[in-house]
């Protein structure tokens, strides 16, 4: 039996930290479904279709990856993908508090739902999409923070 997991997020934009978690999840699971959340409440920098396209570009060299947009409850999305496993990255203690609450909430909706927390490799532990956006919006170099495949998407945003 092949085991799938979901790695959900807004990926606005996808970072090297996200990519690190995806690669490490592939060492545990046969397939990783990268679930790009609509997240209108976050007022995304990129539209949903662009974020999906960026994730596909950033992961095109990896096998056993599927990129799918979703806008419903994560547990419902997981059921539709026939998996009960979700991967979440933890950078700091502050992430843990929030993720623990989400994990409990999801588990209350579906008792088979399992959240697996992965710490990023230390060199990526400070990277977040919001930090990348802030540096980018102030003209800083983000080339070491994001996959090279998405730099053209960011350059297009400058225009």
Swiss-Prot record:
One of its GO terms (molecular function) is ATP binding. Its EC number is 2.7.7.3. Pathway: Cofactor biosynthesis; coenzyme A biosynthesis; CoA from (R)-pantothenate: step 4/5. Keywords: ATP-binding, Coenzyme A biosynthesis, Cytoplasm, Magnesium, Nucleotide-binding, Nucleotidyltransferase, Transferase. It is an enzyme of class 2 (transferase). ATP binds at residues 10-11, 18, 89-91, 99, 124-130. Homohexamer. PANTHER family: PHOSPHOPANTETHEINE ADENYLYLTRANSFERASE. This is Phosphopantetheine adenylyltransferase. The lineage of its organism: Bacteria, Pseudomonadati, Campylobacterota, Epsilonproteobacteria, Campylobacterales. The gene is coaD.
């Amino acid at each position: 039996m092949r085991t799938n997991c979901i790695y959900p997020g807004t990926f606005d934009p996808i970072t090297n930290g996200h990519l690190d978690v995806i690669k490490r999840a592939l060492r545990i699971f046969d397939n990783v479904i990268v679930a790009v959340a609509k997240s209108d409440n976050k007022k995304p920098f990129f539209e949903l279709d662009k974020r999906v396209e960026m994730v596909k570009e950033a992961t095109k060299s990896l096998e056993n990856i599927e990129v799918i947009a979703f806008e419903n409850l994560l547990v419902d999305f997981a059921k539709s993908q026939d998996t009960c496993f979700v991967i979440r990255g933890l950078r700091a203690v502050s992430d843990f508090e929030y993720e623990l609450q989400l994990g409990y909430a999801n588990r209350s909706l579906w008792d088979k739902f399992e959240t697996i927390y992965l710490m990023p490799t230390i060199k990526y532990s400070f990277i977040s999409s919001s930090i990348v956006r802030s540096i980018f919006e102030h003209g800083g170099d983000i080339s070491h923070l994001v996959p090279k495949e998405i730099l053209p998407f960011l350059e297009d945003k400058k225009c």
